[in-house]
Amino acid sequence: MGEALNGLKRNIMCGDARESHIGQKVTVMGWVQRNRNLGGLQFIDLRDREGILQVVFNDDLGEEILEKAKSIRPEYCIAVTGEIVKRESVNPNMPTGMVELKAEELKILSESDTPPIYIKEDLDAAESIRLKYRYLDLRRPDMQNIFKIRHKTTKAIRDYLDQNGFLEMETPILTKSTPEGARDYLVPSRNYPGMFYALPQSPQLFKQLLMVSGFDRYFQIVKCFRDEDLRANRQPEFTQVDLEMSFVEQDDVMALNEGLIKHVFKEVLGVDVKTPIKRMTFKDAMEKYGSDKPDLRFGMEITNLSDVVKECGFKVFTDAVANGGSVRGLCLEGGASMGRKDIDRLGEFVKTFKAKGLAWIQLKEEGVKSPIAKFFSEEELNKIIETMGAKTGDLILIVADKNSVVLKALGELRLELSRKFDLVKDKSEFNFTWITEFDLLEYDEEEGRYFAAHHPFTMPMDEDIKYLDTDPGRVRAKAYDLVLNGEELGGGSIRIHDTKLQEKMFEVLGFTQESAWERFGFLLEAFKFGPPPHGGLAFGLDRMIMFLAGTENIKDVITFPKNQNAFCYLTEAPNIVDEEQLKELGIETIKKEDTAE
C-alpha cells in the first residue's frame, strides 16, 4: 500500500523547474521515467505532464531513504521534497536540463507493475495494445502535448465566439431518428416499449430551432454519433464545433469563420492565416483537381483534351467524347524516366476507380514514346503535348470515360503521384480554400431518386430555385466547405427558412407530404412562426486538432478512441448485457446465422 500525502503539497511541476528556482525548497510529484545508480548516487527522472526533472539522492541521506530510492521501478508514482540546485552535467536537450532536485524526503505514493508499453515518444507498440492500455499511452509526452493543444484550441474557439456575440448552448443527446444519410445509433426507451431515441449525427435541427427562438448566435462543442463503416480517419463518436447565425448571408458566415480560423491558428501555433481565404466553385474544383476537397499545396491540374482529340484516329478517345464523356490528362513533370512496370501499376490504380485504363505519353530526349502514338498524326500529337503544357522529360497520363469516372480517377491519381513523388515540398504549409456552389442534389441511379448532397435543409441558390420542378440536378446550393491541405475541415450552408420551400425540397427527395411531416413536422411547424434567415457551419474539432498537432491519426487526438470496427479495447465495448435488462426494455436479441460453407 502506498504512503499517504498527509498534508504534503506539490508546489512546482517537474517540467517547470528552471535556474530561477535554484536554492528553493520544493515538492514535486509524478511518475518515474527511469532510475539508475551512478557512482553511489541514485538518479531518478521524474515525469509529470509538464516534463521531466532529474532527482538526485546523495549518499549522505541515510541508508533507509537510499534503499527506498533504489527500490523504485519505472512508473512508480512518488513525491519528492528537496532543493533545486544547479546541475553539474547540463543536458541541453531538456528544458529542465540546467537544474536538478537534490532530494531530502521521499514518499512512494503507489507502485507499478512492469508496464506493457514503454512510456516514450517513439513508441512502436501495436495499436491494439496502445488502446487497451490507453491510460499508459496517454502518459507519453507527445500524447500529453496533443491534449494540451486540444485544450488551447477549444479555449481559443470559445474566446473568439464569445467576443463575437455567440451564446454556448446545449442541445439534446436523446432525440428523434430522422434517417437520411448515415445510420443512427438507437437507444431503446423503457417507458415507451418498442420505441427508440437516436443519438444525434449533428445538432442541425435544434440549432435551427434556436434561431427561430431568437437567440441570434449559437455555438456548441458537441459530441455527434454516426453508425457507419469506419474509414481511416473516422470514429463512431466525434466532436464538432457547431455554430449558427441569424440574419446573415453566405459571405457573413464565411467571414466570421475565417476570423475564427485565423484566431485559433494564431493562438495555438503562432501561425498567421491569410484572409480572406481564396474561393473555388465545386465545378472548378472537380474539373481542375477531380475532388471537392483539393490539395492546393502542389499544382498538376487536370487538363481537358476532349476538343483536341474528338476527331482523332484513336477510337477510345473519340467514343468517350461522342458518348458525352471526356478525355482528360495530367502532366507529371520529370516523369518520362518512369519505367513501364511503374506506369502499368498506375494503370491498375485508376481501374480501382472504374476507369477502363490509362493512356500515357513519355516525352524523352530521343522523342515521343507511347503505345497510342501510332493513332495520331504528328500535328495531333503536338497539339496534345501543347495543350498539356508538357516539355521534354515529362509524362502525360490520360483517362477517357464518362466525366464522373474521368475526374474521380485522375483526382485520385493526382494524389497518388503526389505521395509517390513527394510533390508537396513544404509540409508545414497550411493551404486553405473555400469550396462553394455545390450541387444541391445527387442522383442515385440504383434507387432512382435524388438525395441531398449535404442535408435536406440547405437553401438552393436564388437563381436556381426555378429548376426544382423541371431539372433538380441543375440546382446549386448555398453551401460552402472549408478545405485545408486536401481535407475537409468544416462545412455549412444557408438554411431554408420557409415552410413551402422546405416541403418542396422534401418532395424532390421523394418524401410524401405525410412522411415529411411525420419526420420533420416539428421543424415545419416552427417555420410558421416568423423564422429569421439563418445559416451556419460545423468544424470537425478532431480533424482540426490533427492539423494543429501534426498527426495523421485521428485516434491520437481522442482520449479513448474506438478501433476501425468501432470496438473499444480498453472497456471491451460493445458488450453483451444482462437478459433482465433486455427484458425490461422489451428487446430480444437474434443470433446471426453462420453463413460460412
From Swiss-Prot:
Its EC number is 6.1.1.12. Its main location: cytoplasm. Keywords: Aminoacyl-tRNA synthetase, ATP-binding, Cytoplasm, Ligase, Nucleotide-binding, Protein biosynthesis. It catalyses: tRNA(Asp) + L-aspartate + ATP = L-aspartyl-tRNA(Asp) + AMP + diphosphate. It is found in: Cytoplasm. One of its GO terms (cellular component) is cytoplasm. InterPro entries: Aa-tRNA-synt_II, aa-tRNA-synth_II, aa-tRNA-synth_II/BPL/LPL, Asp-tRNA-ligase_1, Asp-tRNA-ligase_1_N, Asp/Asn-tRNA-synth_IIb, AspRS_core, GAD-like_sf. Transmembrane segments: none annotated. L-aspartate binds at E180, R226, H454, R495. It comes from the Bacteria. GO terms for molecular function: aspartate-tRNA ligase activity; ATP binding; catalytic activity, acting on a protein; nucleic acid binding; transferase activity. Homodimer. Catalyzes the attachment of L-aspartate to tRNA(Asp) in a two-step reaction: L-aspartate is first activated by ATP to form Asp-AMP and then transferred to the acceptor end of tRNA(Asp). NCBIfam families: aspS_bact, PRK00476.1. HAMAP family: Asp_tRNA_synth_type1. Belongs to the class-II aminoacyl-tRNA synthetase family. Type 1 subfamily. This is Aspartate--tRNA ligase. It comes from Clostridium perfringens (strain 13 / Type A). The gene is aspS.
